[in-house]
Amino acid sequence: AYGGLGQGLRTAVAALDAVGQRCASTGMVYLMHLCGVACYAAQPEGVEEPLRDAAAGRHLSTLAWSERGSRSHFWAPISQARATAEGVSVSADKSWVTSAGHADGYVISARSPESSGPTDTMLYYVPKGAAGMSVAGPWQSMGMRGNASSPMALSDVAIPAARALSAPGGGFPRMMEILPWFALGNAGISTGIAEAAVQGTTAHLTGQGFAYTGSKLADLPNLRERLARMRVATDKSRAHLSMVLDKVEAGAPDAMLAVLSSKPSASGAAMEVTDLA
């Protein structure tokens, strides 16, 4: 109804693996875009135009969930929406937002106007340039500096009721629906980073050598052993990721536990492999 190729999570992870092999920052931008669009698709009534634009490649989305007071516990925002005649007004300090200032649409989280607890939340769509929303600082990371994950500030941002992306109080379950996309996509990028390190190291060892003997670096057994460890760690990471996808697609009872294991497994492999490179 809205365009796109109709592919699912496994294809998205494979695409993120491929992008991660070339540019991890671009991979993160693409991942957060996919997560944002997944939120649109889950409740499309008020976001039909951006959903069609995203399918046509004219709209970049992202998530604005993490806050200074809740840090990595993105599912428990500190900010609370205030009911207005037209919808809600939201003020929040979002600690990092990938593609901040560049994305065309932002999926923001806040506690419901009548919230009874930290997980009584809502998700909303906010377009780029909305009054009261701004980038609050630079992105100064040690790595992946190209994804512009800057903090953003929302000051009395007016959001019409039609732009709600969850049922009343339904933000938390919607976030849990998006979590597999985020965690497995992140794992795909990390696996891509590891694969790129293996390929780059292989090219270096087979392409460089010693002029006086004519031998290659790959002829040295200690370097071949390091490369073998890199290859094994990368293959294990990809195999684990495939196993998790199998569980998700089969609706296995431990699927969510497997999803949560995917990110540390793949990121750990990426660190191991790049350290060996």
Locate the predicted segments by residue:
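A short core secondary-structure module
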Residues: 93-134
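Buried hydrophobic positions in well-ordered alpha/beta secondary-structure cores of metabolic enzymes
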Residues: 15, 36, 90-92, 124, ...
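Glycine-rich beta->alpha junctions and the first turn(s) of the following alpha-helix
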Residues: 141-233
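Residue-level recognition of alpha-helical structural elements
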Residues: 46-47, 216, 223, 251-258
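Extended, amphipathic, non-transmembrane alpha-helical segments
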Residues: 199-204, 237-243, 271-272
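Glycine-rich flavin
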Residues: 2-98
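Alpha-helix capping/hinge segments and adjacent helical runs
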Residues: 253, 264-277
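C-terminal helix-coil-helix/basic helical segment that borders enzyme active sites and/or dimer interfaces
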Residues: 235-265
